[in-house]
Amino acid sequence: PGQSRTVRFVLGWYFPVPDRVSLGFLRGSDTLRRQYGGRFADARAVVEHVAGDLDRLEADTRAWVKTWYTDATLPHWFLERTLAPASTLATNTCYLFDDGRFYGWEGVYCCPGTCEHVWNYAQSIARLFPQLERDTRSRVDLGIGFHADTGQIGNRAEADMAWATDGQCGTILRCYREHLTAPDDTYLRANWSRLRRALEWVMDHDAGPNGTLDGAQPNTLDTVWYGEIAWITGMYVAALRAGAEMADEMGQSEFADRCRALAESGSRDLST
């Protein structure tokens, strides 16, 4: 009685098998496991790992906080807004499966498919774990969700193979981003033929052609818009410019010139 002591404890959990009902539409869902299931045998093993490496884990965490906040010269409101979305990775919105596939809902258990028209606006993962984004572009957007006959990308891959205009333009931009963060041009060369076809699919919806999109434009607001829409046309123009840069690197100058001409036309339209 009257004494006190400090006790450290770790709250650990281990649920390597995801909910296969809600994820039943995913390819191979009947055997998918969380990636950490291959690293640890049970919750005790997780706790023992934390306990055995606690000093380093704490030191790395403190170093991150010091680097990002204490030593930063940027305003804190900017730092908060930049990093806060990364916390989503630690929720049940996101999964990393044992086959290496990254998957994300729009929100926890809501709206499937790592959907383009939501996730193309996210930036945190690409900067923190660029290899995950490169794999998702190749495996999902230009793989599982890709219509090889047309170039259309299924907005939600297996869950919905229809397209979203802002989503497909955004995915082309993401592919360029993934190339820019890659150590060499291997990623671009492996994906270029499908990436070009995906851009050509969007260009097919430019009836002019004049650098602006026409007809139905399904988008992230869960609706379909028509006509010249500055926001979506702006994404189309950006995708054209990204496509031109990649085409140049691939030695396809004629296609690059075509993309730039449309982008210039679209930019003029946006400014008037």
Where are the model-predicted features located?
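Beta-rich accessory regions
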Residues: 1-6, 19, 265-270
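Alpha-helical scaffold segments in carbohydrate-active enzymes
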Residues: 194-205, 235, 242-245, 262-270
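Inter-helical turn/loop segments and adjacent helix faces that build the functional surface
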Residues: 178-189, 242-260
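Substrate-binding groove/exosite segments of carbohydrate-active enzymes
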Residues: 3, 7-8, 14, 34-206, ...
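Beta-strand segments within the central parallel beta-sheet cores of soluble alpha/beta enzyme folds
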Residues: 189-196, 215, 254-267
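Aromatic- and carboxylate-enriched substrate-binding clefts and catalytic-loop regions
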Residues: 159-160, 217-221, 225-234, 258-272
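Short, Lys/Arg- and Gly-enriched loop/turn segments at beta-strand edges
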Residues: 13-23
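Hydrophobic faces of stable alpha-helices that mediate helix-helix packing
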Residues: 168-172, 233-241
